[in-house]
From Swiss-Prot:
A GO cellular component entry from the record: cytosolic large ribosomal subunit
Classification lineage: Bacteria, Pseudomonadati, Pseudomonadota, Gammaproteobacteria, Thiotrichales
Functional summary from the UniProt entry: This protein is located at the 30S-50S ribosomal subunit interface and may play a role in the structure and function of the aminoacyl-tRNA binding site.
InterPro entries: Ribosomal_bL19 (IPR001857), Ribosomal_bL19_CS (IPR018257), Ribosomal_bL19_sf (IPR038657), Translation_prot_SH3-like_sf (IPR008991)
Protein name: Large ribosomal subunit protein bL19
Organism of provenance: Francisella philomiragia subsp. philomiragia (strain ATCC 25017 / CCUG 19701 / FSC 153 / O#319-036)
């Protein structure tokens, strides 16, 4: 059981401007990157490998292919470093965690699109 003060602080920090997405969906995450004294937005485009719903501590992992190598990055859903999330394609998958996609290449790595 959490303290009421902790719940109040967590509730105020939860973001409501982010779209709903599920594992398998192709998304673009725009996040703020700080390099020295400059700030810019960098896009990370891939599909959602897993999603963890834990209130303020929610997180999701996005996987993309970069120069033939698989790159995975885990984001905190309610992080202030995330500028925006856009859903490119919705997927029709039957699993909550798509870890099996790590070992697939080529046509086998395709995900069926939801119509």
């Amino acid at each position: 059981m959490k303290n009421k003060f902790v719940e109040l602080v967590e509730k105020s920090q939860i973001r409501t401007d982010l779209p709903e997405f599920n594992p398998g969906d192709s998304i673009t995450v725009n996040l703020w990157i700080k390099e020295g004294d400059k700030q810019r937005i960098q896009a990370f485009k891939g599909f959602v490998l897993r999603k963890r719903n834990r209130g303020l501590h929610s997180a999701f992992t996005v996987r993309k292919m970069s120069s033939g190598m698989g790159v995975e990055r885990t984001f905190q859903t309610h992080s202030p470093l995330i500028d925006s999330i856009t859903v490119e394609k919705r997927a029709d998958v039957r699993r909550a965690k798509l870890y099996y996609m790590r070992g697939l290449t080529g046509k086998a790595a395709r995900i069926k699109e939801k119509v």
